[in-house]
Amino acid sequence: IEKEGLTVSHDSIEDIDRLILDVGKANVKGGVFAVCSKGVLSFAKGEMLENSTLRSVKVSDEGVYQFGNKEIEFKIYPFDGKIANVHKKFANCCLDYDKIKGEIVVENRREGEKIRLVNRDFDSDVRKLVNKSFRLEDRSSAVILKDSQGVVFVEGSGAAERVKIDSETVKILAFTIK
C-alpha cells in the first residue's frame, strides 16, 4: 500500500482484506482503487462505477413498493407505549412514524451521507456500512430510506437514532424487504 503512495490505515487494510477473499474493487484513497481479480491484487486510478441508476421511490402510504429487484412492504401500526422484547431483526425495520420529517424516499446512497444508528454515540458513513454489509455486486441495490432531514435506515445496519421507537411513540412504521 505504501509503495503505491497511500497511507496505511485500519479501514484501507480491512477493505483490501475483504477483497482478497472475494472479487471486486474498493476506493482506498482519492480515486485510487484496490482491485482483486483472479487472485491478483492491484491498484488502479479512476472512477468506481458503484452508484446504480435505480430510480428513487417515494413512499406515500402503506403498501408494497418496488426498488430494483427488491420489494419493500410498509405498514403503519398504532403503538401503546409499552416496549416489549422484540427480535433485533424485526426491531431494525421499525421506525417512529411521527419522528419522520416529510416523505420517506427509497434510493441509493449518495457520497458523504452519514447516519447515527440506534444506541450509538457517533455518526457512521453510509458508504462504509453498505460496503461492510454487502458484496460489491449487491451494494447498488442496498435499500436506503431517507426523509427530508437525511438517512433514517440502512439495510444491513439498522435505523437512525432520531427515529427510534421509545415510550413517546404513538405510531410505528414497520417494513419488510424481500
Map each language-model feature to its residues.
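AMP-forming adenylation/ATP pyrophosphatase catalytic core
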Residues: 1-178
